[in-house]
């Protein structure tokens, strides 16, 4: 689906693969939250992969990492404690599809829909700020 949309809309600059994380065990679930303006939100985690040896054909990994760092910085500036540490490692999920492709985890299965939705709205503001400035 992503490739079909990229072909149909070649001006797409950002592809976000959005998920909920799974942390903990069945007996001990983790619910990462922060509070902004008196309202609880699900903490987010941005994942940025790399391909330092060129084996995966993931040429844009450095640009994606730079984009991830900008979003992380903007989100923390606007909404302190919104983000968990950026996850940077030798993986590529769907981040290789184009420059500006990232995987973002919004909370976990233990967070409420309201917490995840609130964070999604704040995250959208942070991403828009990065793209427009």
Q: What is each PLM-predicted segment?
A:
Residues 1-5, 32, 53-62, 105-114:
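Second-shell loop/turn segments in exported
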Residues 1-33:
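Catalytic-core regions of hydrolytic enzymes
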Residues 9-14, 42-43, 81-82, 99-100:
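Loop/turn elements at helix/coil->beta-strand transitions in domains of secreted/extracellular proteins
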Residues 20-25, 51-54, 91-94, 108-112:
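Solvent-exposed loop/turn segments at secondary-structure junctions
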Residues 14-17, 45-48, 85, 102-105:
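Structural recognition of the beta-strand scaffold that forms the well-ordered cores
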């Amino acid at each position: 689906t992503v490739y079909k949309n990229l072909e149909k809309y070649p001006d797409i600059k950002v592809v976000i693969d959005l998920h909920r994380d799974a942390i903990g065990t069945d007996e001990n679930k983790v619910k990462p939250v922060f509070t902004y303006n008196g309202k609880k939100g699900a903490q987010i985690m941005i994942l940025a992969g790399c391909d330092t040896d060129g084996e995966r054909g993931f040429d844009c990994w450095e640009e994606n990492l730079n984009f991830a760092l900008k979003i992380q910085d903007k989100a923390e500036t606007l909404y302190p404690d919104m983000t968990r540490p950026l996850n940077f490692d030798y993986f590529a999920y769907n981040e290789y599809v184009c420059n500006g492709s990232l995987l973002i985890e919004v909370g976990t299965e233990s967070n409420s829909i309201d917490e995840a939705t609130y964070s999604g709205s704040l995250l959208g503001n942070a991403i828009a700020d990065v793209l427009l400035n």
